[in-house]
């Protein structure tokens, strides 16, 4: 990986204290970016700046904190990897669960994008990376996780809309739709977190890749 690819670029990874988000944060840092991570668990990685936040409890209110708003306004590279998964058939979903999934998996990434865009527009440069669900690039049926998949399908609309509307400002917006990083139905469909992160870095690094919905799932299809 090119050490100075993102030299000095202020970067924020929401959900960057674990999993794919942590791998993206570390790879950004290795490429010269100045990286902040937001998450519930404290990061032990010395090259990352930590902003502790609990979106499961605080929801969108975490974005209104002065320290968070300052980072969002300065952000040149933004990745939102946070997105809780819920597997339940529709008839078992409570109103509270519908609300939580809608906020956490759709409204929160959208609000983050709205917050970082003005600064990126002013600087005429920006990179946004969002995460959908497995095969949520189009409308399809999901038997046991309709709420989650519905919210993540909406993320694809945000990606396509931002990529079209803000490309004139030097801003790109792309998405990864990852497969199973654990508990795969079979070994052939298992993807490594570090590999998914590498695909994210590739999308961020190119000004010509814009509006991409990248299926990173070894060809798995929902049934």
What do the PLM-derived regions correspond to, one by one?
Residues 127-154, 159-160, 164-167, 180:
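Catalytic loop of short-chain dehydrogenase/reductase
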Residues 168-171, 175, 187-222:
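C-terminal helical subdomain
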Residues 89-90, 97-99:
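Substrate-binding pocket helix/loop in short-chain dehydrogenase/reductase
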Residues 79-87, 218-219:
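Conserved NAD(P)H cofactor-binding loop of Rossmann-fold oxidoreductase domains
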């Amino acid at each position: 990986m090119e050490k100075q690819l993102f030299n000095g670029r202020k970067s924020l990874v929401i959900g960057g204290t674990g999993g794919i988000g942590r791998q993206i944060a570390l790879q950004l840092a290795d490429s010269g970016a100045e990286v902040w991570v937001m998450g519930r668990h404290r990061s032990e990685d010395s090259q990352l700046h930590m902003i502790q936040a609990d979106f499961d409890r605080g929801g969108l209110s975490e974005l209104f904190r002065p320290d968070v708003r300052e980072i969002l306004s300065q952000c040149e590279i933004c990745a939102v990897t946070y997105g809780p998964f819920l597997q339940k058939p529709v008839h078992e979903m409570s109103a509270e669960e519908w609300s939580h999934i809608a906020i956490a998996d759709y409204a929160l990434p959208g609000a983050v994008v709205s917050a970082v865009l003005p600064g990126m527009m002013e600087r005429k440069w920006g990179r946004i990376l969002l995460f959908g669900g497995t095969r949520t690039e189009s409308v399809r049926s999901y038997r046991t996780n309709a709420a989650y998949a519905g919210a993540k399908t909406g993320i694809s609309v945000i990606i396509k809309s931002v990529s079209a509307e803000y490309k004139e400002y030097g801003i790109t917006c792309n998405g990864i739709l990852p497969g199973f990083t654990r508990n795969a139905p079979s070994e052939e469909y298992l993807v490594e977190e570090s590999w998914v992160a590498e695909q994210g870095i590739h999308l961020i690094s190119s000004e010509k890749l814009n509006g991409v919905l990248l299926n990173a799932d070894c060809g798995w299809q929902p049934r």
